[in-house]
């Protein structure tokens, strides 16, 4: 699953941000903006999409950043999300890989803070212990309960287990494996990541309403307004 890592001249490790996307060019553009705003260098963004996804291909044609690489995968046979994530890891050049979901917002300090947290803990990987939720339908913002939030994973590429060949829950298995090996650090900086709840989420709205929202805390109105502005621009 590994290719040769590429640190920069100063020896700072390259971080590969891995984005699997399909048919969401507006959200993808925000994910690209978040990548461009990162304070960590060197970094690269890998965007994995399927060959029948014309909307993503058209969006990619407008971006010419040297540190953004597009990986087009044949649409047939159909691959699971786990399989597509494995392709992204295999294509990554970084010493670290970071899950970079296209529908969420990533603070400019996210990569720097998580790599630093992993290194300080002597761990191979780091996830956030809490993050923020933005419910786009209701226009409400929350802070999550404390747990290992899989979507925020930043990990050494050589420590990454394969994602299971499933369409949902693939990142949970990877994080559980890293934790079981004692390789996982947790960072409690919820403002580094805003998870967007919307109609196209992998798990659907019922998962938010039944499993996540009951354990989350609604944010005060002034903070909620800042979250709204951050996510919607």
Describe each model-derived feature in a short phrase.
Residues 1-37:
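N-proximal low-complexity "stem/linker" segments adjacent to membrane-targeting elements
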Residues 13-16, 44, 173:
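Cell-envelope/extracellular polymer assembly enzymes that use nucleotide-activated donors
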Residues 109-140:
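Conserved donor NDP-sugar-binding/catalytic core segment of glycosyltransferases
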Residues 168-177:
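Acidic donor-binding loop at a coil-to-helix junction in glycosyltransferase catalytic cores
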